[in-house]
Every structure is written in C-alpha cells, then in structure tokens.
A protein has these predicted regions:
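Acidic/histidine-enriched, glycine/proline-rich intrinsically disordered or flexible terminal extensions
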Residues: 219-239
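A short hydrophobic/aromatic micro-motif that marks alpha-helical segments and, especially, helix-coil
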Residues: 103, 127, 185, 224-225
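GST-like fold's C-terminal all-alpha helical module
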Residues: 111, 118-217
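GST-like domain detector, emphasizing the conserved glutathione-binding G-site
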Residues: 1-161, 233
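Short catalytic/ligand-binding loop motif for oxyanion handling, primarily in non-cytosolic enzymes
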Residues: 88, 182, 224
Length: 239
C-alpha cells in the first residue's frame, strides 16, 4: 500500500523525505513503475511509495525529474545527508540490484547478462505493438505483436528467461505481458494458434511468483483506468 495512496498533483506539497528510507515515485497503473516494484518485492527491500498524477504533475516532482516520468528513486545519502534521485525503470532496477546483495537478479556471467539486455532493449517492439492495439490500430498491432513475440518464444530454454527462477529479465518483460488480457476486446488472444507454448508456460509460472502477486493491480481496476486512458482522460484514483 502506498504511503500516500492518492496520486499527488499540481499544487500538492512534496512529503518530507526521511533519512534511512527509500522512496519510489510511482503511478498505480504504470508498467514501467511496476518493473521497479517487482525488483523491490523480489529482493524484499522496504520502501515508501508516492504516486504521481502523470497528467497534472506536481511542480516539485518536475524539479526533481524534468520529464516527469515514473519510476523515480530517491533517498538521503548516509554520508553527505543530501538527497539522491535516479529516474528510468531499467536504471532504477539495476541500481536496486547492485546495491542490495541479497537475491541478485542479474546474471554474473557477462555474456549471459549481455544476451538478456539485448532482449530487454528490443522489447520496445512488444510495447509499441501493445500500445498500437490499445490506441486504436488493432489489426496492425496484433500482427506486429505476434511477429515480435517469436524471438522471445525461441529464447526461452527453461522455466524462466533467467533459468529455474526469475531473473531481472523476467521482471523487466512481465508488466506488459500481465496486461495482455486487456487486449482481448481489440482482437488479440495470446497463443490462440498454439505457437507460443513456452511463453504460455512462462506466463503461468510468473503468475505464481510471489513478487508478481505482491504488486499486481486487480485486472478490473486496470480496465477502468484503461477506459479513460484510451479516451485521453485517465483517472488515477478509484474509491
């Protein structure tokens, strides 16, 4: 549960940052923020969550992060007592993994780590197709999504991309896959032709993962958000 459940917006005040407390700036429905939350959950790192209204962004947050995107990670440095801030989901996730030695998520082998990073970097082909479907071009988007899923089906050689248990790559890919059921009304049914059996098994394994379950937002709530998002009027807070 976020420390401030409501999404803060223009005119709000930045909650005071406490020493020895890690803060994540987030948005309840943002898949990029979910990446960081999955890493935090997988590594059992305590943190404070502050949700940001991404349409009506607080002035104080724009001073910390000019693009106004989430996630953002902030803390008070133990030695200098100055606040530190890191943006971008991949950078935040890598930092969390490198600074918390328990349950390391990145491979120790440099070549395997590079292979994983290639798949993560090329994942934009999946996210682009996903949003193409969501924003009203379902026919081309569905074709693109099915085409761009093939390399990921071929890359799976174990239960997870990381092997017998999830690694960083699994958590970085997951948020959009979790949202695939939202595309059914637009005509996309994952694995309807049976061409992605390994990815289908991976999805089942990920859904059973403790970190995934811990940060998942109920599908019905996400559907409500996406209805407003598609109309250009996203609603962030639901009673």
């Amino acid at each position: 549960m976020p420390s401030y459940p409501k999404h803060l917006k223009t005119g709000s005040e930045c909650p005071p940052l406490k020493e020895n407390q890690l803060r994540l700036y987030s948005m309840q429905f943002c898949p990029y923020a979910q990446r960081a939350k999955l890493v935090l959950a997988a590594k059992n790192i305590p943190y404070e969550e502050i949700n940001i209204d991404l349409v009506d962004k607080p002035e104080w947050y724009l001073k910390k992060n000019a693009p106004g995107q989430v996630p953002g990670l902030e803390w008070i440095d133990h030695d200098s007592k100055e606040s530190k801030f890191i943006p971008e989901s991949l950078i935040v996730s890598d930092y969390l993994d490198e600074t918390n030695s328990q349950n390391r998520l990145q491979p120790t082998d440099p070549y395997l780590k590079a292979q994983h990073r290639v798949l993560i970097d090329r994942y934009s082909s999946i996210t682009t197709a996903f949003y193409k479907i969501m924003r009203g071009d379902p026919k081309e988007g569905v074709a693109d999504l099915n085409k761009n899923l093939k390399p990921y089906e071929e890359a799976l050689t174990n239960t997870f991309f990381g092997g017998s248990k999830p690694a960083m790559i699994d958590y970085m890919l997951w948020p959009w896959i979790e949202r695939f059921p939202l595309l059914s009304e637009a005509g996309f049914e994952f694995n309807s032709d049976g061409k992605f059996p390994k990815l289908a098994a991976w999805i089942n394994a990920m859904e059973a993962n403790e970190a995934v379950q811990k940060v998942k937002v109920p599908t019905e709530t996400v559907k409500k958000f996406m209805e407003g998002y598609k109309q250009g009027k996203p609603q962030y807070d639901f009673e």
